[in-house]
């Protein structure tokens, strides 16, 4: 049996530059990882089936699950005959803007690479993974990075300074395609990509907090004002910086001290069904 840890990602920045001819948006975003993890195990079967075993009933176990899709893609690409069972211990909130599905798919590709002794380079897996999810290449590598294109052009950056992260997901679901459809690229909105990159290079925590920005936040916030209320609540209760991750609805806050993070946690815990205190990984 093979084990893999699948950490959640957060966006330090997210900018959308223009709509591409292939229907996707050209993005420029800085992402890092946090120690909120799913845990996956992989075991060979005697038949050819892919079986996904996940305890939570709201998580699909068929080909709607990105881990299942990743396993299908790996089997087809590398002509793998023997089936496998994928067991997922799910801790990352779903449909949250934290790449919970993508990180499971990435862990599946890494896990199968070891389980079947394929020894393929991770960069090769990234090129495969982009076929089923734009966050998957980042999740396969799992390091702080500037991602461009659809998300497949990856430039490694320095790890962020050490900090606590309070992650809060309100009780609502958001469809990423719906958010991108409602995005008006003619509306002015500043995303501080370069400032964030410089903050990572210099290890400047205060500048990092000031640079947190997301082009999709006003769009998701207009549809669901809970998002902006949570962000305001975090900042009012001592967050050094706060921003929505991905297309939402999750908002996170950065804090230098654990006591500070606990205070923010207590402030938002009553209005969110899922709140976690974790650490930046990067």
Swiss-Prot record:
It catalyses: 4-CDP-2-C-methyl-D-erythritol + ATP = 4-CDP-2-C-methyl-D-erythritol 2-phosphate + ADP + H(+). One of its GO terms (molecular function) is 4-(cytidine 5'-diphospho)-2-C-methyl-D-erythritol kinase activity. It is an enzyme of class 2 (transferase). One of its GO terms (biological process) is terpenoid biosynthetic process. Disulfide bonds: none annotated. Keywords: ATP-binding, Kinase, Nucleotide-binding, Transferase. Its EC number is 2.7.1.148. Transmembrane segments: none annotated. The active site is at 9, 135. ATP binds at residues 93-103. SUPFAM superfamilies: GHMP Kinase, C-terminal domain, Ribosomal protein S5 domain 2-like. InterPro entries: GHMP_kinase_C_dom (IPR013750), GHMP_kinase_C_sf (IPR036554), GHMP_kinase_N_dom (IPR006204), IspE (IPR004424), Ribosomal_Su5_D2-typ_SF (IPR020568), Ribsml_uS5_D2-typ_fold_subgr (IPR014721). Belongs to the GHMP kinase family. IspE subfamily. Catalyzes the phosphorylation of the position 2 hydroxy group of 4-diphosphocytidyl-2C-methyl-D-erythritol. NCBIfam families: ispE. This is Putative 4-diphosphocytidyl-2-C-methyl-D-erythritol kinase.
């Amino acid at each position: 049996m093979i084990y893999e840890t699948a950490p959640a990602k957060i966006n330090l920045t997210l900018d959308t530059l223009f709509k591409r001819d292939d229907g996707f948006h050209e993005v420029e975003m800085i992402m890092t990882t946090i120690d909120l993890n799913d845990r996956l195990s992989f075991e060979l079967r005697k038949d050819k089936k892919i079986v996904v075993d996940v305890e939570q009933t709201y998580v699909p176990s068929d080909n709607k699950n990105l881990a299942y899709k990743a396993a299908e893609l790996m089997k087809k690409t590398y002509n793998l005959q023997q089936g496998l069972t994928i067991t997922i211990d799910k801790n990352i909130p779903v449909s949250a803007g934290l790449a919970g599905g993508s990180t499971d798919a990435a862990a599946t590709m890494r896990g199968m690479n070891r389980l079947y002794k394929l020894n393929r380079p991770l960069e090769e897996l990234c090129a495969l993974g982009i076929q089923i999810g734009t966050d998957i290449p980042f999740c396969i590598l799992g390091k702080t990075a500037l991602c461009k294109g659809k998300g497949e052009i990856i430039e490694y950056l320095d790890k962020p300074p050490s900090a606590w992260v309070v992650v809060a997901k309100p009780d609502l679901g958001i469809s990423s395609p719906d958010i991108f459809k409602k995005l008006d690229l003619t509306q002015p909105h500043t995303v501080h990509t370069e400032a964030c990159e410089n903050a990572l290079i210099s290890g400047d925590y205060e500048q990092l907090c000031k640079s947190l920005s997301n082009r999709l936040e006003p769009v998701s916030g207009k549809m669901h004002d809970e998002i902006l209320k949570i962000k305001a609540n975090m900042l009012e209760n001592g967050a050094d910086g706060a921003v929505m991750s991905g297309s939402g609805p999750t908002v996170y806050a950065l804090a230098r001290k654990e006591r500070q993070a606990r205070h923010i946690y207590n402030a938002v815990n009553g209005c969110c069904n899922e709140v976690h205190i974790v650490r930046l990984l990067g």
